[in-house]
C-alpha cells in the first residue's frame, strides 16, 4: 500500500521536484541505454531504424554472434523494458506494448488474421481511453491543487503526444505484423515448394539408394566369398609351408647323402630354400660343363681331323706302295720278256750258225743292228729307270724321314709330302708309259713273220754276225748282270719298303701310344661320365624338386592371382564402402546438425513460449496494478479535495515531504538497480536467442535472414561428417545389408523431419525476433507516480525473472551435457573410422606385398622359360650336328667300302701268277697283322673282305658290325673286354636296335 502523507506538500515544490526527478530519470535511462548498447562485440553491425512515431533512441543490434561471445550475449539478452514497473506503480508502456505484441503474435500463430486485427484495434482503443482518463485526472488534480494550468497542461500535452506516438508505434507494429503474415504466407508457399523438391529428391535418393543397396549387397556377397577364399588360401598356404618344410628336410637328407660325390650338388640341395642362388649356381655349373663339353668336342674334332689326315697319309702311302708294287711287277714282266727275247735271239743265232747260206744276210744284219740299237736303247732306258729308281729310293728315304718330321709338324709338312709324292707319281706314270710303248714295240717285232731259212754254210757275213751275236750275247749277259743288280736293287728297295713298314709300325705304335693316351683320356672321360651320371641323377632329383617347387610356385602364383583378384575386388568394395560411408556420414552429419538446430530451435521456442507466458502473467499483473492505481488515484483525488483544506498543515509538514522525497529517491534508485539487473538478464536471454536462432537485425529484414539461413546450410554441408558407426556383431552380409538399408532409411526420414522442424522453428524464431525487436524499440521508462503499490509488483516480477533464469540455466546445463555426450559420440566414431582406415592400410600393404611376390615369381618363371627355350634350342642344334656327324660316318663307311673294292681289284690282278704276285698280299697282310691299332684300318684285311665285297649294305659288313660293337663297348666302357686288334673310330657313338649310328651328347 502507498504511504498516506500527513500534510499536503507545497504545490510548486512538488511540481519542480517531480520534473527534476523525471529529467534525472530520463538522463539515467539514456546513460544506461548508452552503457548497455556497446555490449555487442566489435565488428557487429548496428542499425538504427526509426519507424512511424517510434523513439529514435531505440537501437537494434543485428550483428552476428561468434561462439566466443555467447556468455556475453546470454548476459545481455534481456532488456529493461520488457518486464519492469516504475516506482509509481504504473507499468511502463514498453512492457505493456511488448506483452501485447507477444500476445498478438501468439494469437496470430493460432487464430486467423481478422481476429488479430480486432484484438489490435481493441487494445489501441482501450489504451487511448485510459490515456484520456489519466489526462483528465491529472488536469483536475493539477488545477485543484495549485491552479497552475499551463504547466500541467503542457505536461499533459507531452503525455498525450507520447501516448499518440505509442499508438502510432502500435499501428506500425500492426502493419509490420500484417506484412510479416504476408511474408509468412510466402514462406509457407516456398516451404511447400521446397518440400515438393525434397520429395522429388527423396525419390531420386531412394532410387539411387536402391541401386547402391544392390551394389552393396553384391559387394557384401563378394566380401564373404573373399573372406572364405582367404581362409582357404591361408589353410593352403599352411599346407604348402608344411610341405615346403618337409621338402627342405628331404633336401637336407639328400644333400648329406650326395655330399661325398659333389660338394656343389650338396650345397645346391642344402640351399634348396634359396632357389634363386641355387639356380644361378646350377646355370653356372651347366655353363662350365658346356664349356668343358665344347673344349672336349674341339679336342675330339682336332683328333678326328688328325686321324683323318693320318688316314689320308696312310692311304696315299698305300697307293704309293701299290704303284711301286705294280711298277715292280711291270719291271719283272719286262725282264721276263727280255729273257724271252734273248732266248729267241739265241735260237736265231743257232739257226744262223746251223745254216750256212743266207740269201738275205744284209737284211738280217740290218735287223740285227736295229735290234741291237733297240736293245741298247732299251738298256739305256732300263739303266735310266734303275737310276731313277735309286733316286726315287733315296727320295723315298728322305720322304720317310721328312714324314717323321712332318708327323711332328703336322699339316703343313704333310701337304708338302703329298705334293712331292704327286710329282713322283707323275714321273713314274710317265716312265710306265714309256715302258709300255717299248713293250708294244717288242710285241710288234715278235709278231712279224720269221725270215726264210738261210742257205747252208756260213759265210763271212754270218761269221761277222755270229761275232756280233756273241758280242750281243755278252752284252746280254752284261744286261742280265745289270738286271740281277737291278733285282738286287729291287731287293734293297723291298728292304727299304720293309724299313718303311717298320717305321710305319713305329708310327702305329706311336698311334697306339696315342690310343693309350686316348684310353687314359677315355678313362678320364669315364670318370667324368660317372661324375656326370651322378650329376645327372642329382640334377634329376633337383629337377624333380624343381618341378615340385614349380608346382608349388604355380599354385602360389594361382593363389597370388586369386588374392590379387580378391584384393582388387576388396579395394573396389572398400572404395564403394568408403563412398557409401562418406555419404552416410554426410547424411548423419546433416541429420545431427539438423537435430541440433531443431533442438536449439525447439529450445528457443520453448524459452520464447515461457517468456511469452511470463510476459502475459506480467501483463495481467500490470493490468491489475493499473486498476489498483486507478482506484488509488480516485481515492487520492478525494483526498486531494480534502487536502485543499489542509494546505497550512502541508506547509508545516514540508520536512516530512522532503523525507518522503528522499524515500522516493531511494525507491527510484532501487528500481533502477532492479531495472539494471532485469536488463542484464534480458541481455543474457537475448544473447541466447541470437546464438540459437541467429535472427535478423530489425523489422522486415527477410533478405538478411535468408542469407543467414543459406550460410547455416552451407556450414552444415561444409562441416566434415563423421563415419557411421558400424556394429561389430554383423557377421553375415545379410545383416550388414539390412543394417545399411535401415541406417539409410532412418537417416532420410530424420533428415526430412528435421528439415521440416528446422523450417518451422526458423519461422517462429523470426516472428519472435521481430516481436522482440519491435518491443525493444519502445520507450523503456515513464514518469513514476507517487503511490504505494510498486514494491509488491517489482518483487513479483523479480521472482518470475529469477524462476525464468533458473529454468534457462537448467536448460543450458542440459544442453551442455547433451553437447558433451555428442562430442564423446563423435570422438568414438572418429576412433572407429581411424581403426577402419588402419585396417584398410594394412590390407593395402598386404596387396602391395602380394604384388611384389607375384612380380618376383613372374620374373623367375620368365627366366625359367628362357632357360628352357635356350636348352631346347641347344638341343635342336645338337640334333642337327648329330645328323651331320651321322651322315659323315656313313660317308666314311661308304668310302671304306669303295677302298675295299679298289684293294680287292688290285689284289686280284696279280693272282694269276702265284710266284710273282704272292709277296704283295703277304706284305699287306703283314701290315694288318702287325698293327693292333685303335683306329679303323681303312686298308683292312684283304682276305675276309674278298668274299664280302659284293654286299653293299653296311649292316652286313663285318667291319661295320665291329664298329657298332665297338661303339656299344664305348657307350658301356665297363662291360668292354678290351680293344685288342679290333679297329675303332675316335668318335663317341651309340648304336640303336637297328645298328644305326647316332651320336650321343654328354
Curated annotation (Swiss-Prot):
Mutation: residue 37 to D; reported impact is: Phosphomimetic mutant. Does not affect interaction with importin-alpha
- GO molecular function list: cadherin binding; identical protein binding; importin-alpha family protein binding; microtubule binding; protein kinase binding; syntaxin binding
| Region Disordered: start-end pairs | 1-107, 694-724
Give residues where Dimethylated arginine occurs. 18, 30, 35
Q: Which residues carry this modification: Phosphoserine?
A: 37, 66, 273, 438, 690, 937, 953, 981
Instruction: Give the Acidic residues compositional bias ranges.
Output: 702-716
Q: What InterPro entries does the record point to?
A: GM130_C, GOLGA_cons_dom, Golgin_A
Q: Which parts of this chain are annotated as the region Interaction with GORASP1/GRASP65?
A: 992-1002
Q: Name one GO biological process term.
A: asymmetric cell division
Q: Which UniProt keywords apply?
A: Cell cycle, Cell division, Coiled coil, Cytoplasm, Cytoskeleton, Disease variant, Golgi apparatus, Intellectual disability, Membrane, Methylation, Microtubule, Mitosis, Phosphoprotein, Protein transport, Transport
List cellular component terms (GO).
cis-Golgi network; COPII-coated ER to Golgi transport vesicle; endoplasmic reticulum-Golgi intermediate compartment membrane; Golgi apparatus; Golgi cis cisterna; Golgi cisterna membrane; Golgi membrane; microtubule
Name of this chain's protein: Golgin subfamily A member 2
Q: Which organism is it from?
A: Homo sapiens (Human)
Amino acid at each position: 500500500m502507498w504511504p498516506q502523507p500527513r500534510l499536503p506538500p507545497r504545490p510548486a515544490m512538488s511540481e519542480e521536484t517531480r520534473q527534476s526527478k523525471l529529467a534525472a530519470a530520463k538522463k539515467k535511462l539514456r546513460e544506461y541505454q548508452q552503457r548497455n548498447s556497446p555490449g555487442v562485440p566489435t565488428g557487429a553491425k548496428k542499425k538504427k531504424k526509426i519507424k512511424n512515431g517510434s523513439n529514435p533512441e531505440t537501437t537494434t543490434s543485428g550483428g552476428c554472434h561468434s561462439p566466443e561471445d555467447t556468455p556475453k550475449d546470454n548476459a545481455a539478452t534481456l532488456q529493461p523494458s520488457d518486464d519492469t514497473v516504475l516506482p509509481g506503480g504504473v507499468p511502463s508502456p514498453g512492457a505493456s506494448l511488448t506483452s501485447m505484441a507477444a500476445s498478438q503474435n501468439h494469437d496470430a500463430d493460432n487464430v486467423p488474421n481478422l481476429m488479430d486485427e480486432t484484438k489490435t484495434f481493441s487494445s489501441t482503443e482501450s489504451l487511448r481511453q485510459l490515456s484520456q482518463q489519466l489526462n483528465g485526472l491529472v488536469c483536475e488534480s493539477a488545477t485543484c491543487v495549485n491552479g497552475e494550468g499551463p504547466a500541467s497542461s503542457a505536461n499533459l500535452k507531452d503525455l498525450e503526444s507520447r501516448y499518440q506516438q505509442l499508438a502510432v508505434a502500435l499501428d506500425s507494429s500492426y502493419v509490420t505484423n500484417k506484412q510479416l503474415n504476408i511474408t509468412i504466407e510466402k514462406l509457407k508457399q516456398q516451404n511447400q515448394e521446397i518440400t515438393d523438391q525434397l520429395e522429388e529428391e527423396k525419390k531420386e535418393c531412394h532410387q539411387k539408394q536402391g541401386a547402391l543397396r544392390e551394389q552393396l549387397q553384391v559387394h557384401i556377397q563378394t566380401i564373404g566369398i573373399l573372406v572364405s577364399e582367404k581362409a582357404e588360401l591361408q589353410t593352403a598356404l599352411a599346407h604348402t609351408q608344411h610341405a615346403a618344410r618337409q621338402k627342405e628336410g628331404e633336401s637336407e637328407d639328400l644333400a648329406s647323402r650326395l655330399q661325398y660325390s659333389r660338394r656343389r650338388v650338396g650345397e645346391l640341395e642344402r640351399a634348396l630354400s634359396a632357389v634363386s642362388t641355387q639356380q644361378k649356381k646350377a646355370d653356372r655349373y651347366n655353363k662350365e660343363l658346356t664349356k668343358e663339353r665344347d673344349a672336349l668336342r674341339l679336342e675330339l674334332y682336332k683328333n678326328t681331323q688328325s686321324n683323318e689326315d693320318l688316314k689320308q697319309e696312310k692311304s696315299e702311302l698305300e697307293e704309293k706302295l701299290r704303284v711301286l708294287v705294280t711298277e715292280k711287277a711291270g719291271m719283272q714282266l719286262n725282264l721276263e720278256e727280255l729273257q724271252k727275247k734273248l732266248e729267241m735271239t739265241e735260237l736265231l743265232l743257232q739257226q744262223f750258225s746251223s745254216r750256212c747260206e743266207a740269201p738275205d744276210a744284209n737284211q738280217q744284219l740290218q735287223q740285227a743292228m736295229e735290234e741291237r740299237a733297240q736293245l741298247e736303247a732299251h738298256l739305256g732306258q732300263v739303266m735310266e729307270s734303275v737310276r731313277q729308281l735309286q733316286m726315287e729310293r733315296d727320295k723315298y728315304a728322305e720322304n720317310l724321314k721328312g714324314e717323321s718330321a712332318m708327323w711332328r709338324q703336322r699339316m703343313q709338312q704333310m701337304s708338302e709330302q703329298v705334293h712331292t709324292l704327286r710329282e713322283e707319281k707323275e714321273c713314274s706314270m710317265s716312265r710306265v708309259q714309256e715302258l709300255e710303248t717299248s713293250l708294244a714295240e717288242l710285241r710288234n717285232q715278235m709278231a712279224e713273220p720269221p725270215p726264210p731259212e738261210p742257205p747252208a754254210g756260213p759265210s763271212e757275213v754270218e761269221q761277222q754276225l755270229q761275232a756280233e751275236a756273241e758280242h750281243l750275247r755278252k752284252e746280254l749277259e752284261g744286261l742280265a748282270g745289270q738286271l740281277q743288280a737291278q733285282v738286287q736293287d729291287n731287293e734293297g728297295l723291298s728292304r727299304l719298303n720293309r724299313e718303311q713298314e717298320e717305321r710305319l709300325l713305329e708310327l702305329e705304335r706311336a698311334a697306339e701310344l696315342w690310343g693309350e693316351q686316348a684310353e687314359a683320356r677315355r678313362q678320364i672321360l669315364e670318370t667324368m661320365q660317372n661324375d656326370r651320371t651322378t650329376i645327372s641323377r642329382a640334377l634329376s632329383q633337383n629337377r624333380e624338386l624343381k618341378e615340385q617347387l614349380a608346382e608349388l610356385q604355380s599354385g602360389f602364383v594361382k593363389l597370388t592371382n586369386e588374392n590379387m583378384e580378391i584384393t582388387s575386388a576388396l579395394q573396389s568394395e572398400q572404395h564403394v564402402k568408403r563412398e557409401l560411408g562418406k555419404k552416410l556420414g554426410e547424411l548423419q552429419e546433416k541429420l545431427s546438425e539438423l537435430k541440433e538446430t531443431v533442438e536449439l530451435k525447439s529450445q528457443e521456442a520453448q524459452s520464447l513460449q515461457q517468456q511469452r507466458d511470463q510476459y502475459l502473467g506480467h501483463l495481467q499483473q500490470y493490468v491489475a496494478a493499473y486498476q489498483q492505481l486507478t482506484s488509488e488515484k480516485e481515492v487520492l483525488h478525494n483526498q486531494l479535495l480534502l487536502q485543499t483544506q489542509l494546505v497550512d498543515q502541508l506547509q508545516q509538514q514540508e520536512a516530512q515531504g522532503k523525507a518522503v522525497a528522499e524515500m522516493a529517491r531511494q525507491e527510484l534508485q532501487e528500481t533502477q538497480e532492479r531495472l539494471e539487473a532485469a536488463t542484464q538478464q534480458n541481455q543474457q536471454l537475448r544473447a541466447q536467442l541470437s546464438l540459437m536462432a541467429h535472427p535478423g537485425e530489425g523489422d522486415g529484414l527477410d533478405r538478411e535472414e535468408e542469407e543467414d539461413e543459406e550460410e547455416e546450410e552451407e556450414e552444415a554441408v561444409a562441416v566434415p561428417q563423421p563415419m557411421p558407426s558400424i556394429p561389430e556383431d554383423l557377421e553375415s552380409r545379410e545383416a550388414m545389408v539390412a543394417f545399411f538399408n535401415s541406417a539409410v532409411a532412418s537417416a532420410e526420414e530424420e533428415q526430412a523431419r528435421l528439415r521440416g522442424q528446422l523450417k518451422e522453428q526458423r519461422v517462429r524464431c523470426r516472428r519472435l525476433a521481430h516481436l522482440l525487436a519491435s518491443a525493444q524499440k519502445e520507450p523503456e521508462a515513464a514518469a513514476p507516480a507517487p503511490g504505494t503499490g510498486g514494491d509488491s509488483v517489482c518483487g513479483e516480477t523479480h521472482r518470475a525473472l529469477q524462476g525464468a533464469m533458473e529454468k534457462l540455466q537448467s536448460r543450458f546445463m542440459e544442453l551442455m551435457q547433451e553437447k558433451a555426450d555428442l562430442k564423446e559420440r563423435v570422438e568414438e566414431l572418429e576412433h572407429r573410422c581411424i581403426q577402419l582406415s588402419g585396417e584398410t592400410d594394412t590390407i593395402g600393404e598386404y596387396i602391395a606385398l602380394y604384388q611384389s611376390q607375384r612380380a618376383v615369381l613372374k620374373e623367375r618363371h620368365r627366366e625359367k622359360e628362357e632357360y628352357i627355350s635356350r636348352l631346347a634350342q641347344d638341343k635342336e642344334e645338337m640334333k642337327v650336328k648329330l645328323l651331320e656327324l651321322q651322315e659323315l660316318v656313313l660317308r666314311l663307311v661308304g668310302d671304306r667300302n669303295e677302298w675295299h673294292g679298289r684293294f680287292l681289284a688290285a689284289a686280284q690282278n696279280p693272282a694269276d701268277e702265284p710266284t710273282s704276285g704272292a709277296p704283295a698280299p703277304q706284305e699287306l697282310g703283314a701290315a694288318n697283322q702287325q698293327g693292333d691299332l685303335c683306329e679303323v684300318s681303312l686298308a683292312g684285311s684283304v682276305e675276309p673282305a674278298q668274299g664280302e665285297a659284293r654286299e653293299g649294305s653296311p649292316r652286313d659288313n663285318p667291319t661295320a658290325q665291329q664298329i657298332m660293337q665297338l661303339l656299344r663297348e664305348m657307350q658301356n666302357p665297363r662291360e668292354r673286354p678290351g680293344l685288342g686288334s679290333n679297329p675303332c673310330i675316335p668318335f663317341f657313338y651309340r648304336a640303336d636296335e637297328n645298328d644305326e649310328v647316332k651320336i650321343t651328347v654328354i
